[in-house]
Amino acid sequence: MQGIKKRFAAVLAAALVVLTGCSSRKAASSSRTEDLPDTLSAEEVELPDNKAAYRCTSYQYEDDELVCKYFQDFDDHDNIIRSETAGDPENMELTKLYSYTYDKNGNVTAKTQSYAAPPSTDRDIYFHDRFCYYDDGTLKYHVNYTKDSDSGLWKKNYRKEYDSHGSEVLYISYNSDGSTNYRSETQCEYDSSGNLAKETWHSDGSSMVSEYTYDGAGNILTAVRTESSEDSDESFVYKTEYAYDSRGNLIKETKTDPYDVTVSTEYEYDETDRLIYKDIIGTGSDVHTTYRYEYEKISG
């Protein structure tokens, strides 16, 4: 979503959302639509050895009691390359591993996601993604592949297309034989500053309209999503409100669902604008969840 500005994207990244490598625009040097075929051979799915530049350690608390500790390593492009839990090996989650291929301008052209089950370090590859860009580095196409166990080929799982602003306008998922399983389209409208003002999503008789407002700095202030269906006269409205500090960092996000259940998330940062604390307060939950984040340099 092009209208949600860099500070908001950085918060989500620091809050452990895996990047696709397209959060900033860089001139594209080598990506072409024809580089995204329907199938890939096993030899075409590479696992580059991306080096960790820094680590984020996050601590999850419920009602002030530590319930989980996570380690996440990032490369020097700020993309996550490893995510694992710490603690009792029998209760540990799968370790997630990510490998990236970059063009000369730093755009991600391929990403591979694999898993390892502790204490084993053997990797099982689950997903492979390919990306291509407009000339200015804005993401244009994204194809996700999964491995066919019979043929050993990597086949298209889904495909996304984006407009020149970087907003998703088409999504298609595929069956194992290559036929279309699901399709959705989105029409996007922009304000005079180029911010995404409205997007209308359609698929199989259902629709969803999202409208956005911004402050003078281009930070998103409100997002209102209305969902409806041809089979019903009812519609459902979801609203999210955002607040920022003087440096443009997102400090509060409040979500309200159609039943007036509200969840607020507050964020705190260090002097270099890195996320160090997240506090989730929900009217529909008896559990108070917080996260604390620490960073350490690994290389470079």
Give short role names for the model-derived ranges.
Residues 18-21:
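C-terminal motif of bacterial Sec signal peptides marking the signal peptidase cleavage site
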